[in-house]
Amino acid sequence: MRRLVYILSVIILLCAGCSRQQKAPVKIPLTSAHRGASTIAPENTMASVDSCIKYGVGNMECDVCISKDSVFYVLHDSTLDRTTNGTGDISDWMSADIDTLDAGSWFAPEFAGQRVLRFADLLQRAKEGGLRIAIDYRNGGLQEMLSLIKSKDMLENCNFTFSKEEDIKRFRELAPEVKTLQAYIRSESDIERVVREVNPDIAVVWIDSLNPQFVEKCRKHGLQVLALVLGTDDKTADNQKAVDLGVDIIATDRPVQFIMKYGKATP
């Protein structure tokens, strides 16, 4: 009888050990808020930034535009029409006039008075709140933008995406020490070409294109993987897919909801 109990005990311990080995810690990706926490506050406003910081979102994606008098602003569209009470291209406006615009009322009455966010103010608040910034560069003033980022001591806390090859080359010349250059990769077969031509640090890939082989190939080329899971509709399945694939960053329009379900990024 004792021998039987002993054998059963050993079997139970072995099974428990196997179970522990199978349940490896799940890697939670860094959450990147597309245009800020844009489902609970107007996109690219300070209210949206503050919501990211409040809920522990690790990264905020933004587009940087430039005014007529060379002041940098955070705005997704090139025009002011959709998200402010102004009209026309932001590049045709002086900063003093841009600063008077309402960038919150379109979203909800309680956000009336939110302003078009100056990029310098975003950098300062991000620095204070421990928020990384992912910059989608448009055009104009690259050297000046980098100088502004350096003046805020935020260069190591920014990721950069460029759409033009000449901008990428210029960026590498101006900031060779930065290791957070992002590049879009549309398919697994495109990895070698992008690595050869752009030499990025982070692969930006739509979630529909990702699979284990894609991720593994990126890793072999020394790339981190950012999964694009954009849209305000239900992304439950896509979010889970990104987590299961072990991506490094997930870009989402619902960052707070992702954090509430999965928690903050695994160190």
PLM regions and their residue ranges:
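Bacterial Sec-dependent N-terminal signal peptides
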Residues: 1-26
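Phosphate-group recognition and catalysis centered on beta-loop-alpha active-site segments
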Residues: 17-267
